[in-house]
Amino acid sequence: MLDKTRLRIAMQKSGRLSDESQELLSRCGIKINLQQQRLIAFAENMPIDILRVRDDDIPGLVMDGVVDLGIIGENVLEEELLNRRAQGDDPRYFTLRRLDFGGCRLSLAAPLDAEYTGPQCLQDTRIATSYPHILKQYLDKQGVRFKSCLLNGSVEVAPRAGLADAICDLVSTGATLEANGLREVEVIYRSKACLIQRDGEMSVDKQQLIDRLMTRIQGVIQARESKYIMMHAPSERLDEIITLLPGAERPTILPLAGDKSRVAMHMVSSETLFWETMEKLKALGASSILVLPIEKMME
């Protein structure tokens, strides 16, 4: 029996989203042993319980108030939301924030030899998918009539097996589609992982813990997207150098011992520093340019 005074977070039991969710929690300083194949894990240093479940169960656990938070792909969340609305329910939850991992796209794919000039080509066809509600929402807007063939796996084999004329499935590189004689013809939904919270009253202690967690998540994401830059630069070219680094905060300027014409610059940049930018910095007289990753960050 779970202690209801502890914060309950649902996450994918296994898979890419599970690995990235574990990394996020770890970088937030939450110590949890997730190596053992247990459905429930307990944080050592915070009143947090982790429920490890199938990803398509997570939206329902949050919407039904079984857990407080869930880390889930937007595609799975949207499918469950549309499913419940189709049944006359009014699902309630909050999206706390979009995360910086779990990116994917849901696409229509047709046989390589099929002519495709737009969604209207799918009129009166049979389409295999694991996302019937997202597919219906998209094709209804296009005015396309179709029949849905619900499959929970191996969707890409449906056309060859004679089950469907086309498919709607998650795509990464497209290699699996090509191996099954298919090609991606239309992206209908783009998704990333997100953190969602149940509706309803939350205890003061839980809400304070969620606020702390959100601050840490924000810091982790900012750190991933930022770099710490150090260099020596000529004093008379500082404005030009700063212009080359959009998104950078105002730099810290330090004098160099024995060289009054140059300074040391330290700054945090939210922009990716490409080789071309570094070459331009060097052309302006910068030297000893270091670009370092940031582990943690808090504004």
Swiss-Prot record:
EC number(s): the record gives 2.4.2.17
- Reactions accelerated catalytically: 1-(5-phospho-beta-D-ribosyl)-ATP + diphosphate = 5-phospho-alpha-D-ribose 1-diphosphate + ATP
One Gene Ontology MF term = magnesium ion binding
- Tell me which Gene Ontology terms the entry assigns under biological process: L-histidine biosynthetic process
Kindly give the InterPro entries that the UniProt entry links to this protein: ATP-PRT_HisG_long (IPR020621), ATP_PRibTrfase_cat (IPR013820), ATP_PRibTrfase_CS (IPR018198), ATP_PRibTrfase_HisG (IPR001348), HisG_C (IPR013115), N-reg_PII-like_a/b (IPR011322), N-reg_PII/ATP_PRibTrfase_C (IPR015867)
Assembly mode: Equilibrium between an active dimeric form, an inactive hexameric form and higher aggregates. Interconversion between the various forms is largely reversible and is influenced by the natural substrates and inhibitors of the enzyme.
The entry's protein name is ATP phosphoribosyltransferase
Q: Which organism is it from?
A: Yersinia pestis
* Protein encoded by which gene: hisG
